Amino acid sequence: MSSQIQGRYFGTGKPLFGLYFKTAILTILTLGIYRFWAKTRIRKYIWSATSGDGDSFEYSGTGLEKFLGFLVAIVILAIYLGLFQLLLAFIGISIIPEDDSQAAIAAQAVAINLSILAVLPLMLFAQYRARRYKMARTRWRGIRFGMEKGAWGYAFRALGYIFLTIITLGLLNPLATFRLEKYMADRSWYGDARFEQMGRWQDLYAGMKHVFIGLGIIIAGVVFAIVTEGVGIAGVAAVIGYIWLLIGLIYYRVYAFNYLTRNKVLDERVMFDAHLETGAVIKIFVVGTIVIGLLMAVIFGIIAGIVASMSSAIMAGTASPALFVGLAIPYALAFLIAGGLSLVMITQPMIKYAVESMTVLNAVHLDTIHQRAADTGADAEGFADALDVGGAI
Amino acid sequence: MQSVGRFFDGESGQRLSVDLSVDTAADTLKLSHPELPMGSQYWPLVAIRALSDHARQDQLVLSLKADAALDSALIVTARLTVDDPDMVSILRRLCPDIGRVDVPKGTTGRIAKRAGLAVGALVLMIFVILPAMANTLARFIPVEREVAYGKAVVKQMERFMGGRGDQGLTCTGSKGRAALDAMIARLTDAADLQYDLNVNVFDHKMVNAFAAPGGQIVLMRGLIERAKTPDEVAGVLAHEIGHVEARDTTRNALRAAGSAGLLSLILGDFAGGSAVVVVAEYTLTASYTREAEAEADVFALEMLNAAGADATAFATFFDSLSELERLTPDLPEYLSTHPELVDRAAAARAFARDQGVTTPILDDAEWAALKKICT
Ligand SMILES: [Zn+2]
């Protein structure tokens, strides 16, 4: 048994793309019902491609339980959303003035935002539940991961930290990142061993430096424009500052990931190391986006060409319905291909890069860890499925 | 056949390198290691399952068929990883159910129960609870707010149909306007309405009319052109007044707001899904309920009768609409949301038979002016 375990990832593009494409077609044919099985199968692939010390991870969730969890969630959501939206419309009509169109637009904006506020706590709740479900269905060497319940606690804290981050114009973002991750990490287990998030939230400010530089350039550009009344330089500064800010945000996420991983401890003994680099992450994203963009341009170009060459028939109304169906199919296929490519060319390479940049230290201690009792409360992520939270996989 | 596999007992994190051998006579796979209880385990080949969608083709991760459990967290956890290519191919060949997915007993019943509950809850919300709440709440909206809201709706409709600038689509021919006012006066003289009517004609070829909250009614130019007599226009107008007086539009707006997005919850976001959702939501919310339509018809017939106008016109307009329906497969909105034209025409004819003496609602000069209101 080695004392250090290097993460490895064995997944490749072709089989994953095939799996995505096949399950996406089934999803369309079943009017969306197969999507729970589709997501489960893709997770099984990605989990099983990940390995440490030669032993693969296992995703033991099932599409069936996801579907059943979803059915429960829509009952609750239908009642909650239906009543809330109707009451909101009632208040909108009876209180907010709508005599001129300006006010009507403002009223609509308010109503839409309130509606998001109604769903936001549920989405945060769903986020925690989704992570808990994924943990409970993840195994390595036959030992389950797990997470304690605490979704409402997470939702309320997250709401508070989001509010704090907004009113401090992002200055307290590191506090939110750190405390929310700590809330989740401290409730996480591998077998009968507990994780703990160490470190200090103030340490994350080092990762914010490029965000601050980007903002600084934008502000300096604006000040310069006001003082000298030269708009040209302000424009250049705005573009540079904006790009710097975007890259700075990625840098922050990578920095936070590395820091939080390095400061996690399992069972007070097992440590972790991660050294992702911002440049590599951006490269995966940019290369993937360019390749997919070019491919899609070609495919949609061909479809547009066919439409253009037949436009006289379409205008004259002599085009048969079969032609429209014949065009709709390649159009839908092109979307499926784009989805599959982004999974294979962006998501999977990112996972591979992250997994292979991670090391488990003092891994000998893992041998002494025992199985945990099953988390019967960690039922499927129905709310996450219904509200579409949880990201790429 | 001998080889080595990695065994995890599902209880501790310890990895055992077990010796594997297939006993073809007993149809079992033997796992042996000094640390195993009794030194060995026997896995029946029929009960061996491989984890599905496994990324590594050169490897099998095996488990034993679990006792049925719906909660996947409860499934038995012993795992055996086989990397040796010969052993992998032998096991693939000899284990009859290696790729099988075991579905626990009672699954179908459980799906049916939960799906039934979910569909039931949605149907109850969309067709019973939300309409009932909309009916109750609509009564608490002050009339002046309803009028303001209705005007905003009409303005939005106008922009949606292509109206731009100050005047938009509203037709302002003064003689036509006078004829329209005469028609409204004739219809409403005997009636005691709770709303001040604001009737306008939009310059649009669609054969349609609609009512918005607070007494707002819009007739399309296409509808006036399609009508053979002024009484046919009056019939449609009276029907829309019926919707206004019953507050159908306000209730509809509340109901539509409540059910918005509920369908997209179910269908999720897959390719083409959003288009289906939009169409389904439109048909669900753009139409009044069947009862509301029937009541508006009854209201219209009685209003025509009180004004001394011939209710037969109501029927002849339905006849000409159903003819239009046959000619053009893409239904105008008025038709698609007002079904069963033949039945409604018959009801109007039956009503007209009992009517006394009637007079045309407009004279020929006024009718000609109304037809030119948009020029
Ligand atoms: Zn109607």
Task: Give the positions of each predicted feature.
Chain A
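Juxtamembrane inter-helical linkers in multi-pass membrane proteins
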Residues: 45-60, 134-152, 182-204, 258-282, ...
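Transmembrane-helix bundle segments that line or gate the permeation/cavity pathway
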Residues: 1-16, 20-193
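Extended non-catalytic domains of envelope/secretory-pathway proteins
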Residues: 177, 199-213, 217, 225, ...
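Juxtamembrane/interface segments at transmembrane-helix termini
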Residues: 37-45, 123-139, 172-186, 248-265, ...
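Loop-centered beta-sheet repeat module
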Residues: 169, 177-230, 237-238
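Intrinsically disordered cytosolic tails
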Residues: 250-254, 258-260, 271-274, 278-393
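Select subsegments of transmembrane alpha-helices in polytopic membrane proteins
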Residues: 65-79, 203-215, 284-296
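Membrane-helix interface segments in multi-pass membrane proteins
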Residues: 81-119, 217-248, 296-343, 391-393
